[in-house]
Amino acid sequence: SLIVSMLLTGCVSSLSAQQSFWKEDFSAGKLPDGWMIVDSTKSAKCEWIVTDQPYPGSFQFEQQAPPIASTSRGYHMQFRPGVVTGEEITKWNQREEYPNGYFQTSAIDCTGKNDVVLKFQHLFRWNNWFTGKRAGLWVGVSNDGVNWKEYNVMDKIPAATQLHAPVNEEINISEVAANQKTVYLRFFWRDIFSWYWMVDDIELTEPFAHDLALEKVTSHQEIGNTFTKEDVLKVKLKNVGSQPVDEDFTVTASLNNGQKLTATV
């Protein structure tokens, strides 16, 4: 196994210390007041739901998945088009209909917030059969409910990948949300026939001036690796702070045998 930590010279890098000014973990077990769920399919068969249950599976009752193991656990938002399309993906494709749908928050007040970071945890599995031109898991941000800035949060996860741990997503949405009184968030499954998307622990925070996030290991799989002396370890870092990083910093990787690898960036 591999544990990667990160030190930023002269600055503090601690994502958990950020203070959120808005958060929703769905612990009430129902859709929050003022939120909306929209099914954009022609047959109106697919809708986001608030649930604490697993994805029940499809295609001869296979492809099941447990509920997202988010920080808050329990209730979360779940979209499960695979249950509806099942073995009839070809028929859906022939009639040019995708099981698209989204949920949207009520207005969030971001006045006085010069920088805004959207954080959430999600778990998904997708099928690349007959995907549409705008296929993706899209998070939209708007300050008027009409015009949207969208981010595809599939994170280049290959089709049919079974994720076991939630993806911790962080997006700096300051260009749309900073100092705006009516900010809306939208989570939109678009132009993919199956399987599911689970979302939980959505929050808005103010970023530190200098703050780096370690997104993922890019040279190897996240788990189950055996490293040799010839291996080159590569990771993807993301600046989620409000200011550019203009100082060198050190990335340290700790192997489970106690060995440490370091690199200056």
Placement of each model-derived feature along the sequence:
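Extracellular carbohydrate recognition
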Residues: 96-102, 130-132, 190-207
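Extracellular/luminal regions of secreted and cell-surface proteins that mediate adhesion/ECM remodeling
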Residues: 153-156, 199-265
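Conserved Ser/Thr-centered positions that define the repeating blades of beta-propeller domains
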Residues: 105, 140-142, 254
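Terminal, low-complexity interaction segments
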Residues: 157-204
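Extracellular glycan-recognition surfaces and repeat-rich motifs
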Residues: 19-88
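Extracellular beta-strand-rich recognition modules
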Residues: 26, 103-106, 110-127, 137, ...
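Short beta-strands within extracellular/lumenal beta-sheet-rich domains
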Residues: 90-113, 167-170
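Bacterial Sec-dependent N-terminal signal peptides
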Residues: 1-21, 206
